[in-house]
Amino acid sequence: SAGELYQVTYTAPLTGSLRQGSAAALFAALQRAQPGGYAAHMAAGPEPVLSVSPELFFDWHDASGGGRILARPMKGTAARGATPADDAAQAAHLRASPKERAENVMIVDLLRNDLSRIAQPHSVRVPALFHTEGLPTVWQMTSDVQARTRPGTTLGDVFAALFPCGSVTGAPKVRAMQMIRALEAAPRGVYCGAIGVVRPAGVAGPDGLCSVAATFNVPIRTVVLRAGADGATTATCGIGSGITSGATADA
C-alpha cells in the first residue's frame, strides 16, 4: 500500500516427519503425484533434496557466435475442475483473469529486463504470453521469454543477470527481495533457488553443437530432508504465493 512494490512473493516452510521409507521412495511417490516438469533428486550430502518442480528457470545453449536462452516464468494459478467442463472453465477463467494476467506480465517484463543484461541488442522477445499448462492438481499460467546471448557469455554471467528468478521474488526485484528478507523468518535455502544440469561441449543445440548447455529449474514443490540426533527425519517444504494490492486473505 506504500507504493514500494507491484508484487511480492511471500513464502513459509511446512514441516513434517518422514516415519518410514527412504528418500528415493519418497521422491518416486512425489513424481507419481506430480509427473513431468523439471524434477531432481539431489542425494549427495547430509540433506537430500527432492524437487518435483514444474517451473523452468532457464534453458541455455551457448556457441561461439552467441547462444540462445529461454526463460519460462510461472505466475498465475487455478484449481483443476471436478468435471471436464468445469476444468475447461477454470483454465479459461485463469487465461482471462485481469489479476493473474497482470501478475504474469509484471514478471515477464522483469525477466525481459534481466535477460537484456546478457542479450544481443534487440534480441529479447516474448513468443508465448499467458499460456495455461495443466498439472495434476492446478492450472498454471506461464510465458516464454527468449533472447540471444552475447558471444563470450558465461554461466556465471547468466546467473548474475537472472538469479533468483523473478517469479519467486516479485517486482521491483531488489526491493521485493529486501522485503522478503525483512518479513520471512529464515532463509529459503534451496527452495526457490535453482537446481539444474550443465552439459559439456558438443551437445546439439538450435544452432549446431554447443560449447555449453545448461537447464535449471526453479525449485518450488521441493522437499528437504534433515536427519535429527534422535534418528527422526524432518521433511521441510516451502509454500508461497504472490501478493499484490488486489490480493485478498481468502485467496
Residue positions per predicted region:
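Extended alpha-helical targeting/anchoring segments
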Residues: 1-251
